[in-house]
Curated annotation (Swiss-Prot):
Occurrences of domain FAD-binding FR-type (ranges): 106-211
Origin: domain of life: Bacteria
Source organism of this protein record: Methylococcus capsulatus (strain ATCC 33009 / NCIMB 11132 / Bath)
Protein name: Methane monooxygenase component C
Role played: Responsible for the initial oxygenation of methane to methanol in methanotrophs. It also catalyzes the monohydroxylation of a variety of unactivated alkenes, alicyclic, aromatic and heterocyclic compounds. The component C is the iron-sulfur flavoprotein of sMMO.
Keywords: 2Fe-2S, Electron transport, FAD, Flavoprotein, Iron, Iron-sulfur, Metal-binding, Monooxygenase, NADP, One-carbon metabolism, Oxidoreductase, Transport
Cofactor(s) the protein needs: [2Fe-2S] cluster
GO MF annotations, alphabetized: 2 iron, 2 sulfur cluster binding; metal ion binding; methane monooxygenase [NAD(P)H] activity
Length: 348
């Protein structure tokens, strides 16, 4: 018999929220049904974005990737909320702060594919044009740093990506998407995506974005396609003619993976307070830019100055964790560090 259980979710900063979850639905689906947007992405147990600790209660855990949830983590009580079905009331410990949870109804719209451009060996620039709504409006609204869910045509498979451009009345959307060897959306981009196709788009979602702290310098650290929300935020600063000292540390593994360099140089030329450092972890002998990770470049700059910047991070968890450890060691308060983790996986 179907039962209804209470989920108590406690965030990293000690805030809590409660919602109901039926025994035949997973925790993420139940939260969404009640207009609570916990962090998630693939919703198929493959990417680990919704990983959390279940500290109390019994549940069924169904169909998780061992890469996303290794057996030793499962034994410790870690779960993927998109695959967690409650058998009793549950208490969940979320590994992020309350401000990263979105609430309320989220709109959706249709958008047409107008461009599909390979900009590096593993990255696609995916361009969409919002279709007019019932009033004829095309405009697309979001805060730079937020993300949207894109659904593969003819399926219910969706993935989350952040626009690299700014909100605009023309309804244009630009996404920078890493194409993996395996994965539903990666396969779609590689094999099936065509100009003229129509996708369902939900959003905006998320709370990653610029925080107002006066004239504090802003340092942005981006790993791979984590560059997209960073570029959107810096473009907003450009539009506002923000005078803050600004730096972008952009990292990839090899030179063929580099992308968006011309656009970054253009931003650097137009913003007198902006410095861009492109970093390659395994460079060739001809590479003349930064060698190593963007964390290495950030460390060098922090050690050579007395700056007390706000730090914005977007990229894989390992990069985020290393950056957070670095800034803590430099005495930068946690309230000056803002980040968006993403976890590329076979489910992406």
């Amino acid at each position: 018999m179907q039962r209804v259980h209470t989920i108590t979710a406690v965030t990293e900063d000690g805030e809590s929220l409660r919602f109901e979850c039926r025994s035949d639905e997973d925790v993420i689906t139940a939260a969404l049904r009640q207009n609570i947007f916990l962090m998630s992405s693939c919703r198929e147990g493959g990417c680990a974005t919704c990983k959390a600790l279940c500290s109390e209660g019994d549940y069924d855990l169904k169909g998780c990737s061992v890469q996303a949830l290794p057996p030793e983590e499962e034994e410790e009580g870690l779960v993927l909320l998109c695959r967690t079905y409650p058998k009793t009331d549950l208490e969940i410990e979320l590994p992020y702060t309350h401000c990263r949870i979105s609430f309320g109804e989220v709109g959706s719209f249709e958008a047409e594919v107008v461009g599909l451009n390979w900009v590096s060996s593993n990255t696609v620039q995916f361009l969409l044009q919002k279709r007019p709504d019932e009033c004829g409006n095309r405009g697309v609204k979001f805060e730079p740093g937020q993300f949207m869910d894109l659904t593969i045509p003819g399926t219910d498979v969706s993935r989350s990506y952040s626009p690299a451009n700014l909100p605009n009345p023309e309804g244009r959307l630009e996404f920078l998407i890493r194409v993996l060897p395996e994965g539903r959306f990666s396969d779609y981009l590689r094999n099936d995506a065509r100009v003229g196709q129509v996708l369902s788009v939900k959003g905006p979602l998320g709370v990653f974005g610029l925080k107002e702290r006066g004239m504090a310098p802003r340092y942005f650290v981006a790993g791979g396609t984590g560059l997209a929300p960073v570029v959107s935020m810096v473009r907003q600063m450009q539009e506002w003619t923000a005078p803050n000292e600004t730096r972008i540390y952009f990292g990839v593994n090899t030179e063929p993976e580099l992308f968006y360099i011309d656009e970054l140089k253009s931003l650097e030329r137009s913003m007198r307070n902006l410095t861009v450092k492109a970093c390659v972890w395994h460079p060739s002998g001809d590479w003349e830019g930064e060698q190593g990770s963007p964390i290495d470049a950030l460390r060098e700059d922090l050690e050579s100055s007395d700056a007390n910047p706000d730090i914005y991070l977007c990229g894989p968890p390992g990069m985020i964790d290393a950056a957070c450890e670095l800034v803590r060691s430099r005495g930068i308060p946690g309230e000056q560090v803002f980040f968006e983790k993403f976890l590329p996986s076979g489910a992406a």
